[in-house]
Curated annotation (Swiss-Prot):
The keyword Acyltransferase applies. It comes from Dictyostelium discoideum. The chain crosses the membrane at residues 263-283, 286-306, 312-332, 334-354, 439-459, 489-509. InterPro entries: Ankyrin_rpt, Ankyrin_rpt-contain_sf, Palmitoyltrfase_DHHC. Residues 532-605, 619-653 are annotated as: Disordered. ANK repeats lie at residues 58-87, 92-121, 125-155, 159-188, 192-221. It is found in: Membrane. The DHHC domain is required for palmitoyltransferase activity. This is Putative ZDHHC-type palmitoyltransferase 6. SUPFAM superfamilies: Ankyrin repeat. It catalyses: L-cysteinyl-[protein] + hexadecanoyl-CoA = S-hexadecanoyl-L-cysteinyl-[protein] + CoA. It is a multi-pass membrane protein.
């Protein structure tokens, strides 16, 4: 025991005279230096390392807090003064390096690792640094630990849960994809005999479930309670997901090749359009509309179950080409014979139609700007180099494992990264990116021009009918005559007018996007907020502990009672999500979590703590180890609201309305209309390059 002017008592710090940890929490480097230098000058023989490595009431040292609070300069100073990066706290046996991984500052993780931090150490639950980073959705830290730290991607905790189990349980889809593509075992079983798919099913995380099924996870695997993932979904009232898992391997098109799949949808689209044409042509308007609505409902019920999600589908492109072909055949069959003398106009019209076909088919099969995935190993080296030299960290594609260039986006439908991603267009069954965006705009212009020509000649054709009543003599008589005489022509014109109204809006967005240098994806995606941490790990002052203990204990009781989830068996205990703190044997309260809102700086209510499950060896019952007061549980909560998935394919409502930009920040790519247009036309190669790394300011 060291007792130097009451600075240290045992292994804890006397808060009346010692201010190092509080100074570190507040990021006051000068106070830290001044305090330690004062002690050095007053007591040259005193071991400063022992002071620095002394902990608070929970055993957290100054380096713990500096790593978690992301005070990079303080971390460097403490390590230079002899701070131990592998000293475990008394509460959870977690090291400063593990707190650095939780904090998420990759440069701090790098620095602590290079100064002796051990990424393989485990806390009292068996969580190593990789599992901690996974729980907090720190994909860059996970990538660094795998590429540089040498951590095994399948390293388990004491309950045999791997990082993939935790990513599936937490709903971190992008991180899950990254781990699988880095070689994680999708069928690894924990002590309950559960795979990652079981835990994704337990929480009802739809995107991880679909991703794991696509990767080939065993959907019928039984756990120690004889429950499959679909059984667990059913017990948690996730009935849709239970049906999805149960029928995944029995999908009618999942085992056939893409050729038969595409042929089916092409034939179906042609027959469906002919059927709708037959309805409107042979029935009067009201019965036709009723039959049309009923047919659409049947199609929806039929199409959705047999459509492969996130897979290219030629249904809409075939529909578009068929519609245009009908218009072209009508023009050649009726318009050209009716107006044989305007040869130049017919020539221009045929050129427009043929150009449209050329552009459409080229868009169907063209490369929108795929970012090559053949540089994965080099990208990994570039990533490590950026971290080691403290440059800007490149963003990784969790599927392609490449450093994504700026404005690039991975399309889940096309399964590739697209440079300067604009959107995935279901009507061309392809992405719109840097290579084909101009061609896409030309296609819209050609369709608009063909529509104007078609409508003009349609009305001219009706006007030369000698039996037609004059419009001035009666509007109703005029419309009745032409609807009965030219029923197909009028219905098709109305149909094309609806399409043209939407395409005009789309063309407007595309042109203004070029002028303002903004893509449709950037217009439609939600604004990115500041990155939030799910908990602060900050113990409150000792004076506040007694006041807050009763409140947090009451919150814990109510939360536990309202958040119990059961898998529906006697061997599966309830999973209790506990809030706040518990009391230890001495009657003193444990370190409470001081939650902060990163957006406005105001304190918020603590988040629900996730469960760490252990098995009772004597009876095999699943138990929440946080329920027992004497175990001094960690007050850790994880980020449960994953914001990983940005849509790559717009829904029908967004396609029609195309909302205005929701991000109020200035567009960083807008250089003025003239420069934007020049860049769009000529400077396309820049979007294939990874962001030019710059020095990071700390």
């Amino acid at each position: 025991m060291i007792d130097h002017n009451n600075i240290i008592i045992g292994n804890s710090i006397n808060s009346k005279t010692f201010s190092l940890i509080e100074s570190v929490k507040n990021g006051k480097l000068k106070e830290c230096i001044g305090y330690l230098e004062k002690i050095r000058l007053q007591n040259p023989s005193l071991d400063l390392g022992e002071i620095i490595n002394s902990g608070d009431d929970c055993g957290n040292t100054a380096l713990h807090w500096a790593c978690y609070k992301k005070w990079y300069d303080i971390v460097k100073y403490l390590l230079s003064m002899g701070a131990d990066p592998n000293i475990a706290n008394t509460d959870e046996l977690q090291t400063p390096f593990q707190w650095a991984c939780i904090g998420g500052d990759l440069h701090i993780v790098k620095y602590v690792l290079n100064n002796g931090g051990d990424p393989h150490l485990q806390d009292k639950r068996g969580y190593n640094s990789l599992i901690h980073a996974t729980q907090y959705n720190e994909i860059s830290v996970v990538r660094y630990l795998l590429d540089k730290g040498g951590v095994n991607v399948d390293s388990p905790d004491f309950l045999q849960k791997t990082s993939l189990h935790w990513a599936a349980y937490q709903g971190h889809t992008q991180l899950l994809l990254f781990l699988v593509n880095k070689g994680a075992d999708i069928n690894a079983l924990d002590s309950l005999g559960r795979s990652p798919l079981h835990w994704a099913a337990f929480k009802g995380n739809s995107d991880p479930i679909k991703a794991l099924c696509d990767f080939g996870s065993k959907t019928m695997e039984k756990d120690s309670n004889n429950q499959s993932p679909s059984d667990i979904c059913s017990s948690q009232n996730h009935n849709y997901l239970a049906h999805f898992i149960k029928t995944f391997n029995y999908h009618p098109f999942r085992k056939v090749g893409p050729l038969l799949y595409n042929i089916f949808w092409i034939i179906f689209a042609i027959l469906l359009q002919l059927y709708f044409g037959f309805i409107f042509y042979h029935f009067t308007l009201i019965p036709a509309l009723i039959l049309f609505g009923a047919s659409l409902t049947c199609c929806k019920l039929f199409i959705e179950p047999i459509t492969l999600s996130n897979s290219p589908n030629p249904l809409l492109p075939t529909w578009m080409i068929t519609s245009f072909t009908v218009s072209f055949v009508y023009y050649v069959r009726y318009v050209v014979p009716a107006f044989p003398n305007i040869i130049l106009t017919h020539t221009i019209t045929l050129f427009v139609y043929s150009s449209y076909y050329y552009c459409a088919f080229k868009l169907f099969f063209s490369d929108p700007g795929t970012v090559s995935s053949s540089t994965t190993s080099q990208d990994s080296k570039d990533f490590i180099n950026a971290v080691e030299k403290e440059l800007e960290i490149p963003e990784v594609c969790s599927t392609c494992l490449i450093n994504k260039p700026i404005r690039a986006k991975h399309c889940r439908t096309c399964k590739r990264c697209v440079a300067r991603f604009d959107h995935h267009c279901a009507w061309i069954n392809n992405c719109v990116g840097v290579n084909n965006n101009l061609l896409f705009i030309i296609l819209l212009c050609l369709f608009s021009l063909a529509y104007i020509i078609s409508v003009t000649f349609n009305f001219k054709l009706m006007s030369i009918d000698e039996n037609s009543p004059l419009y001035s003599e009666g509007k109703m008589e005029w419309w009745t005559y032409h609807y009965s005489t030219y029923k197909g022509l009028i219905l098709f014109t109305i149909y094309k007018s609806f399409i043209m109204a939407w395409l005009a809006r789309l063309l407007y967005v595309q042109i203004t996007g070029v002028i303002n240098n903004v893509t449709m994806f950037e217009l439609m995606k939600p604004p990115k907020g500041s990155k939030k941490k799910c908990c602060n790990h900050a113990p409150q002052d000792q004076n506040n502990n007694n006041n807050n203990n009763n409140t947090t204990t009451n919150n814990s009781s109510s939360s536990s009672s309202s958040n119990n989830n059961s898998t529906g068996t006697n061997n599966d205990n309830n999973n209790n999500n506990n809030l706040g703190t518990s009391s230890n044997e001495s009657g003193q309260s444990n370190c409470n979590i001081d939650q902060h809102n990163d957006h406005d700086g105001q304190s918020s209510e603590p988040l629900l703590n996730e469960v760490s499950i252990q098995i009772r060896s004597e009876n095999g019952v699943e138990e929440d180890d946080d329920d027992e007061n004497n175990k001094n549980p960690s007050n850790k909560s994880f980020n449960k609201n994953s914001r990983d998935l940005d849509p790559t394919q717009t829904n029908f409502r967004d396609s029609i309305l195309i909302p205005k930009r929701t991000n109020n920040n200035e567009n960083p790519y807008d250089k003025g209309s003239r420069e934007n247009i020049r860049e769009f036309l000529y400077d396309t190669s820049k979007w294939f390059r990874t962001t030019t790394f710059s020095n990071k300011n700390f």
